[in-house]
Regions:
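A Zn2+-metalloprotease active-site environment signal
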Residues: 2-6, 18-204
Length: 204
């Protein structure tokens, strides 16, 4: 009975938590609310900014802000013109240039954009920087963070169900089952999803 109940609850979770990615229309499972993701993201971002060495490169900071504002405006305009105006409230845009030689940038849920100085050594024009920042913003618009969190929650729940199903089996069988499940979750869900998210962000 426990096994059947577990499967039934899982099915209900999946059916009640489906969403679609803007632009691509791909179906995705989102078990965590936007408000929960945004609250967690803002907390992490605030802690990061407190300790991050903010750049004093005036020209670079102006470039990041200029590009970021254009992408933010384009993103909001797209959402509004495609029946997704309610999503705009989830973005409180911020743009920061961090003193770090890494060639990197990221956009957290909620539109918190951080660019590392090292990236400006590669992206010397607004258009070049816009390609990278636009890619990162696409991850936020597509709610890829929420989707990854949801996949982790499903994996944890699946492990619990498997544990119940194998509870009357030998310890060796339980270990084998857990190992196979872990590998299946990693190579069957997590890694393919990561590649899918990158391709989707490029497309968007």
């Amino acid at each position: 009975m426990k096994k059947i109940t577990g499967l039934f609850v899982s099915a209900l979770l999946l059916l009640s938590s489906c969403g679609s990615v803007p632009v691509t229309g791909r179906k995705q499972v989102l078990l965590v609310s936007d408000s929960e993701v945004l609250t967690s993201s803002l907390t992490q971002y605030s802690e990061y900014i407190k300790s991050a060495p903010i750049s004093t490169n005036t020209k670079g900071k102006a470039m990041v802000t200029r590009v970021g504002q254009k992408i933010a405006a384009a993103t909001e305009e797209y959402l509004k013109s495609n029946g997704l105006a309610s999503e705009v409230k989830n973005f409180a845009w911020e743009f920061n240039l961090v003193k770090d030689n890494q060639v990197n940038a990221f956009c957290m849920p909620g539109g918190k954009i951080v660019v590392y100085e090292g990236l400006l050594n590669i992206c010397s024009s607004d258009d070049e920087l816009a390609v990278v920042v636009g890619h990162e913003v696409a991850h936020a618009v597509a709610k890829h963070s929420n989707e990854r969190i949801s996949q982790e929650l499903l994996a944890q729940y699946g492990a619990q169900i498997l544990g119940q199903a194998l509870s009357d089996k030998s310890e060796r069988i339980q270990k084998i089952g857990n190992t196979v499940y872990g590998l299946g979750a990693q190579y069957g869900v997590t890694l393919p999803s990561s590649r899918k998210h990158e391709s989707e962000a490029d497309y968007m």
